[in-house]
């Protein structure tokens, strides 16, 4: 990490935690964990399998359903069902994601790009990024799907940020005035001023930057104290940052490819952490056999309820 942007590791105020196994062999490329308080279940995607998976609070009673194509991210809808970020584009479904309806323009299969991480803002909009399968520079974008209104009963996705490379985590401050965003290739978290009335993101600037030794920032979540928790692909950790970008804590994860995280459980005090075995060599997988599992810890801070798409 850049010492100009955060505390140095090992400083006395940096708290350390260790993650423990929650669900073994959850998937090849698990991402987008979300806690659904209505069902008291953890949900996550396995991107290239195209599945939306779930388990109960103890890690049991696992379920899986397929969208029939790669699924980068999702969000629950206010009235039930899901908004899906598929390889071909955005879609809406009921509880069964195999029966989805496209929203806006769709890409043909096979596509040179696919959808990646996504999340909802505090006002019911859904944001999702795209990336090239080969991670070509500037081959993706960040899209926004507004909630339907009387004036626009059938909104379509709109481009928010063009020319991204690996569009990843996005989250918002509690008051909705700031949006945090990760393009992993940039090795930093950026912050924007956010207009809740329009969904506009303006005045992009670095929030915290990282060194190659840290790995790549991937997914993120924002806790009830407005601290960011950032997963590090290749970094074997989730790191917590204060609202002014100082390192406040590190969760050590026993596998290298940490993809995302979310808070859940009855009190929103469990931090659930997804990981991947995607593109590991046989030797690497032998060294880290729990890759692709979901981990958890109870760090003390708590999260906020999942934000739902209002459409």
Q: Model-derived features: where do they sit?
A:
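A short beta-strand motif characteristic of beta-propeller blades
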Residues: 18-23, 60-66, 100-108, 155-162, ...
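Beta-rich, blade/repeat-based domains predominating
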Residues: 25-39, 67-83, 109-125, 160-178, ...
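Short loop/turn segments immediately following beta-strands, especially the blade-tip
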Residues: 147-151, 192-199, 299-303
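A short loop-to-beta-strand structural motif that recurs across blades of beta-propeller domains
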Residues: 51-53, 89, 140-143, 188-190, ...
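A short helix->beta-strand "capping" segment at the edge of beta-propeller domains
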Residues: 8-26, 56-59, 104-107, 204-205, ...
């Amino acid at each position: 990490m850049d010492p100009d942007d955060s505390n140095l590791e090992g400083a006395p105020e940096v708290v350390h935690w260790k993650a423990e196994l929650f669900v073994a062999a959850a998937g090849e490329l698990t991402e987008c964990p979300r806690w659904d308080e209505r069902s008291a279940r953890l949900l996550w995607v396995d991107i290239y399998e195209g599945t939306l998976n779930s388990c109960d609070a103890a890690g049991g009673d696992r379920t899986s359903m397929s969208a029939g194509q790669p699924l980068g991210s999702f969000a629950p809808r206010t009235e039930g069902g899901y908004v899906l970020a598929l390889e071909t584009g955005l879609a809406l479904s009921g509880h069964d994601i195999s029966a989805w309806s496209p929203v806006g323009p769709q890409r043909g299969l096979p596509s040179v790009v696919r959808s990646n991480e996504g999340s909802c803002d505090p006002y019911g909009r859904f944001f999702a990024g795209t990336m090239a399968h080969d991670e070509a520079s500037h081959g993706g974008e960040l899209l926004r799907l507004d909630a339907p209104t009387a004036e626009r009963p059938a909104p379509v996705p709109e481009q928010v940020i063009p020319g991204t490379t690996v569009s990843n985590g996005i989250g918002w401050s509690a008051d909705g005035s700031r949006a945090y965003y990760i393009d992993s290739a940039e090795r930093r978290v950026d912050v924007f001023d956010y207009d809740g009335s329009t969904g506009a993101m303006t005045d992009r600037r670095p929030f915290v930057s990282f060194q190659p030794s840290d790995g790549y920032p991937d997914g993120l979540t924002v806790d009830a104290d407005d601290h960011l928790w950032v997963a590090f692909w290749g970094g074997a950790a989730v790191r917590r940052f204060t609202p002014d970008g100082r390192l406040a804590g590190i969760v050590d994860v026993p596998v290298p490819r940490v993809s995302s995280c979310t808070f859940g459980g009855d009190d929103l005090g469990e931090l659930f952490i997804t990981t991947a075995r995607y593109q590991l060599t046989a030797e690497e997988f032998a060294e880290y056999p729990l890759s692709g599992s979901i981990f958890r810890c109870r760090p003390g801070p708590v999260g906020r309820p999942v934000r739902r798409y209002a459409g």
